[in-house]
Amino acid sequence: LSQDKRQDVVIQSMAMLDRNYTYGGKKLHTGFDCSGLVSFVYKQSAGVNLQGSAADMAKRTQAIDAQSAQPGDLVFFNTLGTPNSHVGIYIGSGKFIHAANERTGVRQERLDNSYWSKRFEGFRTLN
């Protein structure tokens, strides 16, 4: 992604904060799950069609090291005992935005949070 598109991804993801979480959700008016949020944000802000589950998205993107990660890249976690079972959008400064759960909805988190740091799988970027 170009720097402009990356910035658009971050801005769009921040605009989704506090939206509802809905399992399998992919739409603004009904809410999002983690992959639905990523799919919606990438389509709206960068024109990129990135569909499927978090694991599907991991297969379609390229692993990068933490030093190479830029705002707009994807960050993956193992939350269900399986690799890449959760995805969020990296916004820089050690933070990411994701659709967490029905109680909290779309929120911003820190990667160094004890829950997320234990489950961190890695950063990935579009090819």
Locate predicted features.
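Intrinsically disordered, low-complexity
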Residues: 1-20, 126-127
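Solvent-exposed, polar/charged alpha-helical surfaces in well-ordered, non-transmembrane soluble domains
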Residues: 7, 11-15, 36-40, 70, ...
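Solvent-exposed polar/charged
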Residues: 15, 43-44, 89
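Catalytic cysteine-centered active-site loop
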Residues: 19-71
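Aromatic- and glycine-rich peptidoglycan recognition patches
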Residues: 48, 63-64, 78, 84-85, ...
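Structural motif
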Residues: 72-73, 94
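Short beta-strand segments that buttress and anchor functional surface loops
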Residues: 73-79
